[in-house]
Amino acid sequence: MSLPTYATLDGNEAVARVAYLLSEVIAIYPITPSSPMGEWSDAWAAEHRPNLWGTVPLVVEMQSEGGAAGTVHGALQSGALTTTFTASQGLMLMLPNMHKIAGELTAMVLHVAARSLAAQGLSIFGDHSDVMAARNTGFAMLSSNSVQEAHDFALIATATSFATRIPGLHFFDGFRTSHEEQKIELLPQEVLRGLIKDEDVLAHRGRALTPDRPKLRGTAQNPDVYFQARETVNPFYASYPNVLEQVMEQFGQLTGRHYRPYEYCGHPEAERVIVLMGSGAETAQETVDFLTAQGEKVGLLKVRLYRPFAGDRLVNALPKTVQKIAVLDRCKEPGSIGEPLYQDVLTAFFEAGMMPKIIGGRYGLSSKEFTPAMVKGVLDHLNQTNPKNHFTVGINDDLSHTSIDYDPSFSTEADSVVRAIFYGLGSDGTVGANKNSIKIIGEDTDNYAQGYFVYDSKKSGSVTVSHLRFGPNPILSTYLISQANFVACHQWEFLEQFEVLEPAVDGGVFLVNSPYGPEEIWREFPRKVQQEIIDKNLKVYTINANDVARDAGMGRRTNTVMQTCFFALAGVLPREEAIAKIKQSVQKTYGKKGQEIVEMNIKAVDSTLAHLYEVSVPETVSDDAPAMRPVVPDNAPVFVREVLGKIMARQGDDLPVSALPCDGTYPTATTQWEKRNVGHEIPVWDPDVCVQCGKCVIVCPHAVIRGKVYEEAELANAPVSFKFTNAKDHDWQGSKFTIQVAPEDCTGCGICVDVCPAKNKSQPRLRAINMAPQLPLREQERENWDFFLDLPNPDRLSLNLNKISHQQMQEPLFEFSGACAGCGETPYLKLVSQLFGDRMLVANATGCSSIYGGNLPTTPWAQNAEGRGPAWSNSLFEDNAEFGLGFRVAIDKQTEFAGELLKTFAGELGDSLVSEILNNAQTTEADIFEQRQLVEQVKQRLQNLETPQAQMFLSVADYLVKKSVWIIGGDGWAYDIGYGGLDHVLASGRNVNILVMDTEVYSNTGGQASKATPRAAVAKFAAGGKPSPKKDLGLMAMTYGNVYVASIAMGAKNEQSIKAFMEAEAYPGVSLIIAYSHCIAHGINMTTAMNHQKELVDSGRWLLYRYNPLLADEGKNPLQLDMGSPKVAIDKTVYSENRFAMLTRSQPEEAKRLMKLAQGDVNTRWAMYEYLAKRSLGGEINGNNHGVSPSPEVIAKSV
């Protein structure tokens, strides 16, 4: 046996390493938190890494988890060694195939990063809701508790499945295990060969379907035999626990790590025992070890085998002295007599004829913390004479009173473990740097190391908290650090937003990235921060990491700067050695992105320590120390102050059950209260240079730049610094004009500056919008913004929507989202909310737009002064088109019903009023405004009628005002998982609008390839470059002939985007808008992304067109191209995107081959669209359509 090899990696990689080696076919589909297992598999296959039998596994991405399960089923039936990975809703889509796979006794292992199921809300975080929904499929279910166990059980589960023919579901906790970095011992291939028997593999192959030995499976059976046939599998399941134990024993002999299906630890004469499975067992073991050392007779039973459930083995694993048992489930089954594990344990003891006191409890739903204090709380609760059954721990249930008490100050943290916490921003690289730090510590010292990273669901601007532990012994602490020796705050703004120093221990180190120097920083610390520093005797260090990063050319990414500071202060390695290791990790991490990126990071490392200063700490707090600002102002609504404000302050765990809505319904228009201050620079308007075109407003991803025209009298109480000028548009003569920025909501992306066409003639590098540091401007611009909001909005009926400058005066009803800085999707959502938001219903597919659009604590969908605004909901990823169609048919029916009821009141209202309402076509803004007035008039006249008929009418009266239904999602939904439903809706003819924000990848799950991904682009799940062309969704929709279709790119042509939205809404049927949306996953400069869209259109890589079937009624061609012929080859534009450029570095010949094919795709597509657009309805070529000659041959020659 070879010497042990150690590596520091997370649970996903630990599992994928084994699953890859033991597979020939791997069917994948992305879903958080399991996606990295598929990503690793795809990357290794792209590197031609062989499996255990010397062949490279075939990795295939499917359109959904249902598709992946079907592919797995087919591959298994054909004799291949096959696996897949999933979680949550993805597992739900696999259930039908799982029943089949198990029923056919087909060996395989499905690896699941266990995650919550969407119920009253979606959650990407971990519990056992998903796997418990699979417990009746016939799959064996094995639970691993740590990264090491996940690595080991990937092998044990597979070996047992081959030996028994029973497929296995191997699960581990999402995020807590899947994303936790741990130093583990890797399994050498000889151990895998020792456990995987050749005879089992050959038997599996021998059962394959083949025409050389034809047989039939998947029959339809009748009542005469189905029952008997179902019972034939009993011997296989009965033998499984014995076989598993044999495999575990052999594994222990080979590795020295010993497991049991039901493993007890604790006092040999324990009286109180906890039973549970998953990562919580590690915390429970740490706590039980601590308490038994103090003489307490307590214990823990780790359940590793959940299905088949071997009750006799579970009972026999416990000491005979046990009197009370608490069974903990990490899921909730509403309406059940108890959660699954509880019921199984209860049944096991009943059948054994032994009945200690057994109670059940719930813990840890959606990655809710499970700490030693809670474990002790459960054990203490068992000490009561009549302990509460069906309890919860870790929450305050003041509604049903299920929660039990515990002492949160109880701790089992060892003094030998160094504990560090880092507060960062999703876009600053903190998490990535800390993952590298953990690897350096784990692999270059004798320490064991653990890293865990807490994210919220916002995009790249989210708060991240990294928890690092390292010490001389294995680390079982699967919970967040509450007592930190080292605290680093990588964003100055956090100090005034939440309690950064609360976990710091006495005498600890505090490192802060600050815009202030060492001499001035103390007086800038908030009063509470100063007091904590003094009270806890903290050593304080500061660096202006933003300046260091900017000077090195790294922009906002301060990660390597702060990482260097950490190693310099922590002393875990000699300083020079640490810096050398950091540089090695930089090369490894950024090498694929180009040597320039590597050199920038190394430059930052080299210049860091010269800018790191220790801060002298006074003995008392400064008299003029600033106070921490309130999380939300006093004038915010009560629910915002008392509930959402707590979540914003990172105190959501303290909210009681009664504070939260029972059905998941939340108010809109709440992002206005969350001032994140994440933009270090904000745009500053120069009215003397501005041409008042509106471009900066229309492209702003977060609706923080707005324009208004108003009468001069409105300026009477304007702040001194409030800027304005005379309105230039002849429609607004005599009015004043202002462009104003919301300073605390701006993310500092700089897109507005890049698109601004107005140049300062005296200083050519300046424009009408220029970036400036936010901090000095914050107070002044906050006052200006508040004043600006109080200015009246222009009358919507007076605006000419054919002009951008006019249209952008419409109030956005989508504002301040948590999307990435420079997001390419949100400008479209803002635009549609401006145009139709006051009458709009949104069905939003799961994806980026559902997360920044509907993630707690605040939501960007807003309301106007009348309280109207978009009504929004998310169902699932796969059913959004059908979900939105449900909106439409319900509205149509209720509108019809309202009309029927209205007619019955003709006597009270008069025929004229009834007729006026029913005959209003509502095709214009003015029509809709008039209809609202008429309907309101009717409601006023009928509201005092207390008849059932009147009350019924009033409940549906508002449906007489036209409602605009928008079905919104990304390309992963529209091109892949939801395409079947989308196609059905396209064929329905119903009046719905569909907006596909095409980022050409699965942006929400981290940038995996979809069928929208263009050929030659590198993405996750397409590590070797996507070999196939992009799906043409628009052309497919056009084949119906009665669907309005538009392909738009706001950065290429603003006016065409507006026109497409207006036409889509006006079209009396299905409309589909496909909107190019740049994304950070493209590896581009987000500041220049809008202008890059124009370059893509100029190259023909993206087409601008509108297909309006109504034109056919006029004898015109429905297809209108809104662009000229391609002007440049695509390789002159796409290589500014790293997703294309990186393949030229890793596989230059393959990159060249794929790029040539990609250019051919563009040429062919353009030629076809141009041909279609030039045809008249009679079939002849219309030579006067555009007057532009095609040039695909010229383009082809340049490639």
From Swiss-Prot:
An example Gene Ontology molecular-function term: iron ion binding
Cofactor: [4Fe-4S] cluster
Residues bound to [4Fe-4S] cluster 3: C820, C823, C848, C1079
Superkingdom as given in the UniProt entry: Bacteria
Cofactor: record remark: Binds 3 [4Fe-4S] clusters per subunit.
EC numbers, comma separated: 1.2.7.-
Domain 4Fe-4S ferredoxin-type: 681-710, 737-766
Family, per entry: Belongs to the pyruvate:ferredoxin/flavodoxin oxidoreductase family.
Protein name (record): Putative pyruvate-flavodoxin oxidoreductase
Species this protein is from: Synechocystis sp. (strain ATCC 27184 / PCC 6803 / Kazusa)
